[in-house]
């Protein structure tokens, strides 16, 4: 609190000083800081339920020995390197395209148009990465005039967005995991964090760039284990009919 001095005449002829208090002015914004805010009552429509996926759409491929390897290592060699560390090969190779929350009515519908969208589509598998506790290969949809003649490879993004748009238009509920497009290769769940981080930096994964080309054979709609008493079940499966010679 600021104080000012003022002269006051004294009866004894001497000059004395008295102090007059002056209040400091406060800005309106500071006063608002202490105003109690009123909150409206919570309404049912204000609540949102986080729905977990029940099924996923995936593409499957032929035997890995049939895949075209342009550079890097075959997968059986990778598994041989990881075996002493406790790495477990995945039971099947696939790429997940979408996560869905499906009802019994949804499961009775036709998902075959997805196979049409993937006609004459190839995927490139490249760059080993550690995704949570799994060794994966990044995946990209590609266009290449002739993969066997080392023609330029163009990474495109057309079929998968089309599939997701079609699912939304059909009224299906999509779940966004935030994970990049990938193919799981080996489970490293039994390893500690230090060993997992060491594996991903091993020279065998970094010396030569990994590049493989795979052609999808079928589209599956599969139930997630947690939503089906821990059992995975293929609900629908549709073959992908590529053009002859593709």
UniProtKB/Swiss-Prot annotation:
GO terms under cellular component: host cell cytoplasm; host cell nucleolus; host cell nucleus
GO process terms (BP): symbiont-mediated suppression of host cytoplasmic pattern recognition receptor signaling pathway via inhibition of IKBKE activity; symbiont-mediated suppression of host NF-kappaB cascade; symbiont-mediated suppression of host type I interferon-mediated signaling pathway
Stretch list, region Disordered: 1-28
Domain of life: Viruses
Motif Nuclear localization motif: positions: 22-38
Biased composition (Basic residues): 19-28
Subcellular locations according to the entry: Host nucleus; Host nucleus, Host nucleolus; Host cytoplasm
Quaternary state and interactors: Interacts with host KPNA4; this interaction inhibits the nuclear import of NF-kappa-B complex.
Biological function: Plays a role in the inhibition of host innate immunity by inhibiting the interaction between host IKBKE and MAVS. In turn, this inhibition prevents the production of host interferon beta. Additionally, inhibits host NF-kappa-B by interacting with host KPNA4 and thereby preventing the translocation of the NF-kappa-B complex into the nucleus by this importin.
Entry protein name: Non-structural protein ORF4b
Protein species of origin: Middle East respiratory syndrome-related coronavirus (isolate United Kingdom/H123990006/2012) (MERS-CoV)
